[in-house]
Amino acid sequence: MLQTALGTRGMVTAPHALAAQAGLDILRQGGNAIEAMVAAASTIAVVYPHMNSIGGDGFWVILPPNGSPLAISACGGAAAAATIDAYHKRGMKRIPMRGPWAANTVAGTVGGW
């Protein structure tokens, strides 16, 4: 059976109780929703790592209560040698999906936090 939770001062939901508690603790200390989300996400990375980790990227769209929307792109960069010219010099028309010239990026999640 579904259970409905209602609140008037904020709430946090997460797939692990410790993550939800971390977010709730931030709200109780006067933090905002973004700070609570970071607390919950970083906790999930430890207690539930197969669901969320610091090894990815983050793309956020945030709408402040009295402001304009803003975006955060927490995407890590590729290696400095992964340039268009470098691929063309090696006769490549596309970036390979695998192998030493696949342009994997460095994780950007923590930078977004």
What is each model feature region?
Residues M1-Q21, D25, A33-G112:
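Noncatalytic scaffold domains of N-terminal-nucleophile
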